[in-house]
Amino acid sequence: MKHKGQKIQSFICHFYLIILTIIAIFPLVWIILSSIKGKGELTGNPTGFLPKTFTLEYFRHVIFDLGFINNIKNSAGIALVTTLIAIIVAALAAYGIVRFFPKFGSVMSKVLVTTYIFPPILLAIPYSIVMAKAGLVNTRIGLIIVYLSFSIPYAVWLLVGFFKSVPIGIEEAARIDGANKIKVFGTVVLPLVAPGIVATAIYTF
């Protein structure tokens, strides 16, 4: 009897999950099917589910006529440059905070992460004023600067945790062997925190 009750409970749970899945994916499926309908069919019967005619004209229009490919290239280029600069700056800052200013670094990390309490829209007007005065409106450099201002604080906060996980003894051993601070950072510390840098780069991108 108990086993039968478990089966009923399992069936109800699976049925409920199936219904939720259908509700979640139905709008996406409807949008995809609508995108391949002919123009007359889409305007004449917008609530129809299955297309009677098939066309890729809308995709061609978006990709070739509206400059979609160029927009993707611009976005990818800006994102790559932003990520590269943010990771370099954040890695140096996080390492300096952990190794040279540990007490100050704990407070600084909290201050950096609290900047995410405020929604980005609050900075829209100040950013617009600053960029307009600097002549950087509608420029790639302006976008990169804005994105860096959002990505660097969180990247520093993330990397501080990874650099803290590196034992100081490893760095001291490298210095005893004759390595300077730059070499220790580049050849000893960075390889150890490489997974954290990759994770931070993915977030920043």
Question: In which residue ranges do the predicted regions lie?
Answer:
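A structural signal for multi-pass alpha-helical bundles of membrane permease subunits
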Residues: K2-F205
